[in-house]
Curated annotation (Swiss-Prot):
It is found in: Cytoplasm. This is Argininosuccinate synthase. Keywords: Amino-acid biosynthesis, Arginine biosynthesis, ATP-binding, Cytoplasm, Ligase, Nucleotide-binding. It catalyses: L-citrulline + L-aspartate + ATP = 2-(N(omega)-L-arginino)succinate + AMP + diphosphate + H(+). Its main location: cytoplasm. Belongs to the argininosuccinate synthase family. Type 1 subfamily. ATP binds at A16, Y17, S18, G19, G20, L21, D22, T23, S24, A44, G126. Its EC number is 6.3.4.5. It comes from Shewanella loihica (strain ATCC BAA-1088 / PV-4). GO terms for cellular component: cytoplasm.
Amino acid sequence: MSIENNKASVKKVVLAYSGGLDTSAIIPWLKETYDNCEIVAFCADVGQGEAELEGLHEKAIASGASECYIVDLKEELVADYIYPTIATGAIYEGTYLLGTSMARPIIAKAQVEVARKVGADAVCHGCTGKGNDQVRFEGCFAALAPDLTVIAPWREWSMVSREDLLDYLAERNIKTTASATKIYSRDANAWHISHEGGELEDPWNEPSKEVWTMTVAPEDAPDEPEYVSVEMEAGRITKVNGQSYTPYGALMALNEIAGAHGVGRIDITENRLVGMKSRGCYETPGGTVMFAALRAIEELVLDKTSREWREQVGAKMAHLVYDGRWFTPLCESLLGASQPLANLLNGEVVLKLYKGQAQAVKKRSPNSLYSEEFATFGEDEVYNQKDAEGFIRLYSLASRIRALNVK
């Protein structure tokens, strides 16, 4: 089918809508470009905050949408996407806790569900042609709804700047509160907020204080440390400071506590899926505490080979999530294979929060393999130190044979 015939066949589109400048311009552009098709706006509430959602329905209708669905995904995001991912030990390139990446599959899934509900024949996103998100969304669409047409305006239209978008809306008498002077590109959800653009595009520039919005600057954090207790069952946080929470509630509580101490800031230059490098500043206060607590319990309960395997799975899982491959057999397999070890992650960790750091200082687990009796340097009745001699001879046998062959 030709591009023009394909455009003529699109009658109803579900747009991933944020209310920002880009998606506000996309609504009239779709109607003009796709033969006055019907536009249904869809917004995923993934914990980006009430300010981002306020007036969204009215704004979408004013821009030309026939309907606007705001779907609450907060609990599902944390319970079904974030917890399973971090329980594998996934962390991208050693530092990034995958905040944006983990939210994309659930948003795409919900968008497809709305499309099915309203009988749409196309879905649309506002991702740029240079970023990772276009691949993530469209990879999910391909896995969940290959029959739907996917529209990516940034790969079609001629507009290249915020000024172009503002002029486009002004010509059509569509009001917007956006300005041409927006400095940073931000993306927020319950797990984190990302910051890109502005002075951050030069890696020689230190991020200004205006970049950070979710955490206190470590140097301005309290001069006294705060201790926070985290309890978990099967790798899922169930209590914070002795109080029971839902998965989302626990994350919100830790975000507030850790953010006040400047915990969870990173400034990285990462390898994008599309081939280029990009610099991003990320704030993940509660997630940083959760990840540290999980690692602390892992140290107690997992034997050496289990931890080695877990590190390999975590590295692969991080790339799958980052690359938008959530709805794939391999991702499903890794999540399933990781669960038996995750089931062992029960216990309590006390973390010391101070000036940007979250340090596990106490930990205990009913599944702990650590024994003070075995580990002590004093005498015990279980471990005979003389037994180590035979073990060492066998362990080093290959090295011994190699050395003898050289002679």
